[in-house]
């Protein structure tokens, strides 16, 4: 096999050959390495010697813009700062500057509805594990077309199973790092098993989290339970759902909302199981390890919480960061 020796002058023709159907979802990317925004997917690159690439040494957040408003951005930036402190990574910009970069990138993308992925890397500098060989951290912001769960899953529910992949230790569980190998294996496990999601278990048999999802249980007594955050990521969507669920307690649709250990058997016997995530907001799980949950159909609390979340996302101006000047 003869290898092509490619040079800079070849890039224009390579860009035409490069495009694939999925690239249509990549709308814009800001790179602090390039110092600007690109909209051609061929240019959406990260240096191979960036420690985020070869060591997973970076952190990230994913959030969405709905009708020209970024939802709950401050919660994501707060968690980004927590992750940065935990891995001793200096953010190359303050929250206000990061917000301006995100807003500017969305504007250039030309869309009002999108999913944004914000990465902060250790930066380029070499191929060892030594973080000090990187002169400075870098920021990459990718704006993509919005994605969500199929309407069928919202209407009929999803199937989940317990995972065989070891749960993360507490220190790493609450760092949203770019080292997501356990999460990748959990998703592979779900696809291979023919279910939508798998749920991690700790050493004592208590529920953890999905590959990118938090889980909640509505008991037959009307208690909405969530696993403790000690071994799982403090999800922004589930945190918001907890706040909103208090109105259901006041309306006597729920008895209370708690964080506690949840066994598999308790989950099997629950009346509803709920999944929470940035892309789909909330989904009902109607089958767990082959056990039908509750009536086998999405329940009342799912429908009520879904409505509350949708109203919060669309109408809660206190959690909106406007992208366009007219707003």
Regions found by a protein language model. Give the residues of each.
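Short, acidic/charged, Gly/Pro-enriched secondary-structure junctions
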Residues: 96-127
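Helix-start/capping segments and mature chain N-termini
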Residues: 1-93, 100-104, 126-327
């Amino acid at each position: 096999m003869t290898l092509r020796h490619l040079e800079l002058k070849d890039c224009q023709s390579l860009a035409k050959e490069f495009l694939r159907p999925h690239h249509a979802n990549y709308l814009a990317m800001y790179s602090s390495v390039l110092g600007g925004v690109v909209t051609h997917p061929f240019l959406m690159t990260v240096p191979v010697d960036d420690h985020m690439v070869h060591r997973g040494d970076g952190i990230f957040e994913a959030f969405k813009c709905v009708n020209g408003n970024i939802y709950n951005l401050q919660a994501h930036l707060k968690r980004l700062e927590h992750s940065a402190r935990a891995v001793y990574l200096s953010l190359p910009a303050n929250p206000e500057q990061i917000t301006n970069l995100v807003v500017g990138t969305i504007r250039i993308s030309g869309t009002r509805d999108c999913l944004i992925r914000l990465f902060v890397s250790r930066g380029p500098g070499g191929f060892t594990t030594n973080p000090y060989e990187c002169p400075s951290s870098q920021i990459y912001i990718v704006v993509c077309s919005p994605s969500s769960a199929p309407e069928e899953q919202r209407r009929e529910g999803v199937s989940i199973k317990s995972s065989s992949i070891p749960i993360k230790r507490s220190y790493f569980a609450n760092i949203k790092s770019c080292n997501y190998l356990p999460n990748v294996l959990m998703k592979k496990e779900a696809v291979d098993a023919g279910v939508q999601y798998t749920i991690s278990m700790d050493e004592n048999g208590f529920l953890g989290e999905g590959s990118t999802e938090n889980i909640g249980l509505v008991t037959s007594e009307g208690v909405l339970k969530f696993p403790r955050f000690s071994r799982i990521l403090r999800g922004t969507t589930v945190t918001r759902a907890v706040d909103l669920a208090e109105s259901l307690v006041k309306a006597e649709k729920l008895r209370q909302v708690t964080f506690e250990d949840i066994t598999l058997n308790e989950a099997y016997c629950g009346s509803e199981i709920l999944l929470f995530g940035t892309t789909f907001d909330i989904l009902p799980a109607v089958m767990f390890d082959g056990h039908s949950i509750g009536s086998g159909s999405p329940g009342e609390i799912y429908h009520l919480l879904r409505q509350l979340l949708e109203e919060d996302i669309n109408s809660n101006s206190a959690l909106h960061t406007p992208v366009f000047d007219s707003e």
